[in-house]
Amino acid sequence: KSGKFLDGEINIRIGESVRGCDCYIIQPTCPPTNDNLMELLLMVSAFRRASAKRITAVIPYYGYKLEVGGQSMQRSKNKESTAAIASADIAQMLVTMGVDRIVSVDLQPPGQGEIEGFFANSAPVDCIEATYAGVEYFRPIVSKDAVIVSANPTCTKKTRDFQSGLLGSGYR
């Protein structure tokens, strides 16, 4: 159970024994990003303290991933900056709190693929590609005259993959 104390701090309570269990926490870190992230970290901690055998964090939206491959990441690689790399810091926080595995959707920004490396060998990362699930969902309901447009240039490949999936699935 997740709630808040009167002062706004997050309060996590586990309502049953999870000792020796495989536990799955489903929590996106979308806006309000920081609140959702803190809730996730505290849930992982609560399950770990309750002696869960394994904790898998299912994070449909992994917040702070947009900086990966961007300006701050490039500066950090060149050691020209001391800026934080939030994606790496969040990965470290999750592992420190006790997560054993991460499952996310479209984890890396298109064309990047670097976030999984932030977890090193400490927590395996599974990335589910939404494109293929989207094809299965939209194929029966999208008109053959539909126009598929990319939100921005970095998403062009995903858009083409989605279109190809529809065309390859009998979409005409």
Name the predicted role of every residue range.
Residues 1-172:
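PRPP-associated nucleotide enzymes
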